[in-house]
Every structure is written in structure tokens, then in C-alpha cells.
A protein has these predicted regions:
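Preference for the N-terminal adenyl/adenosyl cofactor-binding alpha/beta module
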Residues: 4-166
Length: 166
């Protein structure tokens, strides 16, 4: 496999090239800051702090679940790709996904969606996002969330309630 041979070559000839551009901590901090900014914008547009915190945790959970393989076929990234092209569709598309995630026999189109219990997806409630916000979320979704510290969930929930928290 050419890619593996290339990595092996770099291990001996250019090991610096194999170092991640950001540490796990730096990546987690960057993501937390981006979502804190989103939280502030959503609260300023009149959404209640608990609804903002819950919504942001849903988004982050979807990204994490996708990258560890429990949300199939890049389903959330595909949703974001469609919503970036048509921002007014985001609420409908995300509500469909959230509904499927709370259903033991959930589907989005022809895609089977695993059931996620625990309360995060008890409702299909979602919040509207602008095209710019959707592009930022899509950029975040393209990161490898398996490299991000899972403790970010608690941090983002707290920031959704009070964005001034660090």
C-alpha cells in the first residue's frame, strides 16, 4: 500500500512531518472556543440558555458519533453539506436526524440510524442556523472528533448556559 510505505519513509527521513499539526488539547480548545461563539450568537438571537446548551451538545455528539463509527456513512456531514447549500433546510433536516436517533427503528432516507437513548435526543427540537454558522459547523465536523477530548461535552453544556465560563 503506497500510503503506508510513504508514512514509513517519513518515519526515517522526515519524522517532523508525521507530528500532528495540533495537540489533542489545542484541537479541543479550538473547537470549544468556536462552539462558545456559536452559543453566544444563539443566545443573543433570543434562544433560552438550556435550549442552546442542549442543541450544541447534540451537534457535538453527532460529530463525535460519526467519527468513532456509531453514526453511519458520514450522515451528519452529508446533512451539513446539504444545509450549507440551502440553509433554510437545516431545521427540517436536523429534526429528521434527531427523530431517527431517538427511534429504535430510525431511518433517514434509506440510511438506518442507531438508537441513542439517554435523553439527548428525546425531542426533535433544533435551532435555526445561518449559512455562515453552518459553514463553521461543517468545518468542525470535518475534524477528526475521535482526537478531541470527550470532556468537551460538559464544557460546552456549561458554556451554552453561560458563555462567559472558561
Amino acid at each position: 500500500e503506497p500510503e503506508k510505505r510513504e508514512w514509513l519513509k517519513f518515519a526515517f527521513t522526515d519524522p517532523e512531518r508525521l507530528k500532528p499539526s495540533q495537540t489533542r488539547q489545542q484541537l479541543t480548545e479550538q473547537v470549544a472556543e468556536n462552539f462558545a461563539e456559536l452559543s453566544i450568537r444563539l443566545r443573543k438571537s433570543g434562544h433560552a440558555p438550556p435550549a442552546v446548551a442542549h442543541f450544541i451538545n447534540r451537534l457535538v455528539f453527532c460529530m463525535f458519533a460519526e467519527d468513532i463509527g456509531i453514526l453511519p456513512n458520514r450522515l451528519f456531514l452529508k446533512l451539513l453539506d446539504a444545509a450549507v447549500k440551502s440553509p433554510e433546510s437545516f431545521e427540517h433536516l436536523s429534526a429528521q436526524l434527531f427523530t431517527a436517533m431517538r427511534d429504535k427503528n430510525g431511518f433517514v432516507g434509506f440510511e438506518r440510524v442507531p438508537w441513542f437513548n439517554g435523553g439527548l435526543f428525546d425531542s426533535a427540537e433544533t435551532l435555526p442556523l445561518s449559512g455562515t454558522e453552518l459553514k463553521r459547523i461543517r468545518a468542525a465536523a470535518k475534524l477528526d472528533w475521535s482526537d478531541i477530548d470527550p470532556s468537551i461535552f460538559g464544557t460546552l453544556f456549561e458554556r451554552g448556559l453561560d458563555p462567559e465560563k472558561r
